[in-house]
Swiss-Prot record:
Protein family per UniProt: Belongs to the complex I 49 kDa subunit family.
Keywords: Cell inner membrane, Cell membrane, Membrane, NAD, Quinone, Translocase, Transport, Ubiquinone
Pfam families: Complex1_49kDa
Matching NCBIfam families: NuoD, PRK06075.1
Official protein name in the record: NADH-quinone oxidoreductase subunit D
Its job: NDH-1 shuttles electrons from NADH, via FMN and iron-sulfur (Fe-S) centers, to quinones in the respiratory chain. The immediate electron acceptor for the enzyme in this species is believed to be ubiquinone. Couples the redox reaction to proton translocation (for every two electrons transferred, four hydrogen ions are translocated across the cytoplasmic membrane), and thus conserves the redox energy in a proton gradient.
Name of the coding gene: nuoD
Keyword Cell membrane in annotation: yes
Length: 409
């Protein structure tokens, strides 16, 4: 029986629609396991079809941008770990890259090699984590177990380098805190071989799996126009056939010297995005294999040399009075960049991650803005989910690879 316009209170205070017996409103999350703890979707259904989807975010909001405006530039670095916590070194680097651009610092080549290795290692760890969790959401439990075993060995490498497994804090403004430990590169080579084997195993389990393909093919289709209008980036954009990768378009660190491809999709569906994550693991392995021989050819400095912004090496601080005073000022008061503003984009595992910094010449930013890819991808669910079956909502949400640490900030 048809009913009049109905206003539902209090949980659905903003939803007004004329419904019949085939229509209903479903509150998806934030408790649902596939909403990853922080996403609420208000879904309007007609039968099994979604006719409207309203994402609601903010459950993990911590005021990260305002925190950055009340800390010195170096103090803020550990906070960036808590954005995309599945690839925290990428967040560290994106922030450091923006500050270094503002300061016009020249980074030593050895530090660039180490940074690029860490970025690509983090990319592989993030990608294999996505594939495992996405497969688990769809129902492939065994893939989750195999992938997590390999991911653990990647995290062991990060722990050997910086002492932390998840929130690495592995980058510094001006370089890196540590040189690579002895035999670390040998462990990295072993991990690359293990990652190749894990990738082959996952492809054997999924690529020709009829259920997996039925759940992903033609589900969550994104068109090039939709991707551009929503400001999508990364694999969400490249899945539509647009070959845009900031490592190619605006190269940073050593990417200009490296030989790698940018895989693109054809259909823009969830299966295309899964395939691109698998292909990008191959490209990261290819990049690291080019970087390993570069490391031995570099000199030892791992931090930029600029007494106005960067502390002297520890041996100088312990033996030279001027270096000690300079270090005291930088720690107690913080560096003071010139007046100006900068936006520096980077290609994180999720897409375009950039920091906008406006400086008034003080020891903390006047304005700090984070451009996080997951924020735009979650917003696009309002378009992508319309017309999909309710059972496919989990697949579509998972295929965006959104992490809510950088959605809510």
């Amino acid at each position: 029986m048809a009913q009049n316009f109905t206003k539902l209170n209090p949980q659905f205070e903003n939803i007004i629609f004329e419904h019949d017996d085939n229509q209903m409103v479903l509150n998806f999350g934030p408790q649902h396991p596939s909403s990853h703890g922080q996403l609420r979707l208000i879904l309007e259904l007609e039968g099994e079809r979604i006719i409207k989807a309203t994402p609601e975010i903010g459950y993990l909001h911590r005021g990260c941008e305002k925190l950055g405006e009340n800390m010195t530039y170096n103090e803020y670095m550990p906070t960036t770990d808590r954005l995309d916590y599945t690839s925290s070194a990428s967040n560290n680097y994106a922030y450091a890259h923006a500050v270094e651009t503002l300061l016009n610092l020249e980074i030593p080549r050895r530090a660039q090699v180490i940074r690029t290795i860490l970025l690509e290692l983090n990319r592989m760890i993030s990608h294999i984590f996505f594939i495992s969790v996405h497969a688990l959401d769809v129902g492939a439990m065994s893939v989750f177990l195999y992938a997590f075993k390999t991911r653990e060995h990647g995290l062991d490498l990060m722990e050997d380098y910086c002492g932390a497994r998840l929130t690495h804090n592995a980058i510094r403004i001006g370089g890196v805190p540590l040189d690579l430990p002895p035999n670390w590169l040998e462990g990295l080579k072993k991990f690359l071989g293990e990652m190749r084997e894990c990738k082959k195993l996952i492809q054997g389990l999924l690529d020709k799996n009829r259920i997996w393909r039925m759940r992903l093919e033609n589900v969550g289709v994104v068109t090039p126009k939709m991707a551009q209008s929503w400001g999508m980036s990364g694999i969400m954009l490249r899945g539509t056939g647009i070959a845009y990768d900031i490592r190619k378009e605006e190269p940073y660190e050593l990417y200009r010297e490296l030989d790698f491809d940018v895989p693109v999709g054809n259909y823009g569906d969830s299966y295309d995005r899964y395939c691109l994550y698998m292909l990008e693991i191959d490209e990261s392995i290819r990049i690291i294999e080019q970087l390993i021989p570069m490391y031995a050819k570099t000199d030892t400095p791992i931090m930029a040399q600029n007494p106005h912004y960067i502390s002297a090496p520890k041996e100088d601080i312990m033996t030279q009075n001027y270096a000690l005073m300079q270090h005291f000022v930088l720690v107690a008061q913080g560096m003071r960049p010139p007046i100006g503003e900068v936006y520096a984009p980077t290609e994180s595992p999720k897409g375009e991650l950039g920091f906008f910094i406006h400086s008034e010449g003080e020891s903390y930013p006047h304005r700090l803005k984070i451009r996080a890819p997951s924020f735009y991808h979650i917003g696009s669910l309002g378009d992508i989910l319309v017309g999909q079956y309710l059972a496919d909502a989990v697949t579509v949400i998972g295929s965006t690879n959104a992490v809510f640490g950088e959605v809510d900030r």
